[in-house]
């Protein structure tokens, strides 16, 4: 699982969470998708573009837990990854209060309605609060930026807690 999925517990226990190392556990999904598109077209000197990534990049992310006919897509289950990652960074790294975070979302994501932004934020808070127990069990991962969700070293949150609320 990547950091975006870890934040909201979008993983199967002893499936995604099994093992001693989570190579992409410290990387958010939005960054990972941009990096894969870059690797498809450019990639580092000497390696050249990896054209086979076209087949990966053409697909919408999906956990594939439901029958294929259901059309399950991660962003339909959760929210757009760009918004999820913006909420995660503002909440975890910047320690923003719910009202300030909602104001930030309003300014940054003008294509979305007030109701959509409130729903995304409420969903994030609900999933974050419900899934600390999963974050406690994830394997260690590489961290490429200035924060992580590792409860043993950076982001401690109580397993038993009330859900965070957005002011009316």
Task: Locate each region found by the language model.
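ATP/NTP-dependent adenylation/nucleotidyl-transfer catalytic domains that generate, transfer
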Residues: 1-168
């Amino acid at each position: 699982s990547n950091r975006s999925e870890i934040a909201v517990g979008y993983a199967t226990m002893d499936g995604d969470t099994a093992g001693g190392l989570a190579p992409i556990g410290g990387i958010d999904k939005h960054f990972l998708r941009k990096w894969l598109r870059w690797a498809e077209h450019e990639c580092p000197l000497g390696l050249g573009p990896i054209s086979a990534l076209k087949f990966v990049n053409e697909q919408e992310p999906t956990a594939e837990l439901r029958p294929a006919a259901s059309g399950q897509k991660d962003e339909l289950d959760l929210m757009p990854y760009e918004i999820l990652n913006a909420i995660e960074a503002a909440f975890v790294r910047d320690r923003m209060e719910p009202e300030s975070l909602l104001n930030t979302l309003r300014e940054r994501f003008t294509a979305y309605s007030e109701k959509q932004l409130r729903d995304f934020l409420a969903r994030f808070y609900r999933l974050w609060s419900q899934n600390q127990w999963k974050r406690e069990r994830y394997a260690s991962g590489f961290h490429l930026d200035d924060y992580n969700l590792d409860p043993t070293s950076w982001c401690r949150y109580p397993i038993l807690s009330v859900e965070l609320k957005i002011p009316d």
